[in-house]
Amino acid sequence: MDSMEHIKKLKIEGWVYNPDVEDKLGSVYFDRDEDNYLRVTPLKNNPNTYIFTITQGCEDAEILISVVPPDDELALSNTALWIKKELQPYES
């Protein structure tokens, strides 16, 4: 399985995984609208650790780091809830 496959399955209310956007770091992107997105980048040399970058407009608004094991549905669900909570200030 692709190391980012489980991250692509994150269910974050109001945000949608965008399969058309990627970068050289292997990041995946979730969009809310044209100017707001969440980039999830795997941390090199640290398996299952990801950098979540919230971008508003053209500026990085917040950077979060979390461990998300690929075979742990509870960890995936908890991560989605945590990220959703962190995204709330940027949704107005």
Model segments located where?
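Negatively charged, low-complexity tracts enriched in Asp/Glu with abundant Ser/Thr
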Residues: 1-33, 57-61
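Intrinsically disordered, low-complexity coil/linker segments enriched for acidic/polar
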Residues: 2, 43, 48, 71-72
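Short, low-complexity interaction segments enriched in Ser/Thr/Pro/Gly
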Residues: 5-6, 41, 81
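Compositionally biased, intrinsically disordered/low-complexity regions enriched for serine, proline
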Residues: 16, 39, 44, 66-67, ...
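Long, continuous compositionally biased terminal/linker segments
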Residues: 31-63
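Mixed-charge, Lys/Arg-enriched low-complexity segments
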Residues: 53-92
